[in-house]
């Protein structure tokens, strides 16, 4: 059976009905039952960057339409995983410049199934009051990135924040005429964008961010279109150090560094997404930039390195403190 975006999303949302068998009655102590570490600290000069995990989903290899199944299975088995599905984390990032608190994306909230939506709890664990966040810089308007902008009551979660989004994404995802013409399985993406961004726009809390402009001093937008029309990366710079928060340049570090031309079905313009990915890989490998990715294994921070005619992902070493 072929996997479509519709069938994948339907199965993801249905996951909440799964039953679990407990072995607690036989155990001498109860199982803990969930992960503890979902925030990780990284420094960029005088700035502090906190990686925040929102959870993870499993994406079938079939969601990469141009991927060769045998080659994909070989790569995934070599990494110790299943050969036909990919655990895919969702990460957001909190940047403290010393003057401003800036969120890069916000996780999925309640919009993407039961295995996501942990961002708000992890932010609370850090002791961060949502009202203290000054700026939210969106990489793009997909629900696993903007869902956390609303609280559990569907209200604005960050009452004092200004939300920056690219003009291209705003015009595309909030356009009712475009939404009316897309296939039925794409319509929820448009509906959810209006539902979440709408309250911020009505409260005059949204602003357009352009390529090369700063959202705050030291955090600069970089256009990276293809995954969505206005997909945007953010270059965080302080004290001669740099971190490139690149959003959805990749969804699988294992597959797409080895095969940058394997697009995912969620790309709005696959050809442009591939061209952008290759350009960003070349830039980050050549300049030895540290990257932070929304769908790179948590904490999502590492490097792209050349590997023959392709590339590989090298995670940064975890550092205490």
Outline where the language-model segments fall.
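N-terminal secretory signal peptides and thylakoid transit peptides that target proteins
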Residues: 1-16
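Cap/insert and terminal regions of metallo-dependent hydrolase folds
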Residues: 2-4, 235, 239-321
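Metallo-beta-lactamase
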Residues: 28, 117, 124, 128, ...
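Divalent metal-coordination and catalytic microenvironments
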Residues: 46, 95, 105, 140, ...
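Active-site metal-binding motif and surrounding structural segment of the metallo-beta-lactamase
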Residues: 92, 114-164
